[in-house]
Amino acid sequence: LGLTTAHGQIPAALARLDDELARRGIRFRPHCWLSEDWFSPDGVPGIAIPFYLAHPRLTRLERRMMHEVEGGNLRCLRRTLRHDAGHAFDPAHRLRRRKNWREVFGAASVPYPVSYVPRPGSRRHVLHLGHWYAQSHPTEDFAETFAVWLAPNSTWRNDYADWPALRKLLY
């Protein structure tokens, strides 16, 4: 198909991610490639972006067949990239090996649950992608926290001022 990350809304979203990382003083830039879905392989400092986001016709087809497109608009695309940048940042700096990271987020070696029961009233985790996803696993907790922290014009200091999750944002 000749698709690359230089097509669709992807280049603008990646440029924005670069700007957000630079504004926070982070020199790391995740490697990005097209794949069948969003993911950041464990131990790899990069982000897989769904191929259907590289062309508007494929995006429309995905919406028609699946009834949704994760990252299908620029706002959602940026939010998901921030989240996956957190996943990529972790292995780039070997964060999960640090004792203080484990004390704040938990052990990354804990197996992912087959399913999880979210606690909507919990204030121990940030809210970013929805469905209280940060509660599902320590690495998701970090990725969601990183995304909230990275978002430009975020009011997280006020939003989470009285929450135990603030400790994670200050990490």
Report the location of each language-model feature.
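Active-site-flanking alpha-helical
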Residues: 86-94, 147
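Hydrophobic (often cysteine-bearing) scaffold residues that line and stabilize catalytic clefts
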Residues: 9, 13, 74-78, 82, ...
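Pan-zinc metallopeptidase signature
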Residues: 4-5, 134, 139-171
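Active-site-adjacent bridging/hinge elements
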Residues: 54-63, 112-124, 147
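Flexible glycine/proline-enriched surface loops and loop-helix/loop-strand junctions
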Residues: 124-132, 154
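Auxiliary, metal-adjacent structural segments of Zn-dependent hydrolase domains
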Residues: 2-61, 70-71, 98
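Short pre-active-site segment immediately N-terminal to the catalytic Zn-binding motif
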Residues: 60-82, 131-134
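Post-HEXXH active-site segment of zinc metalloproteases
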Residues: 71-79, 91-125
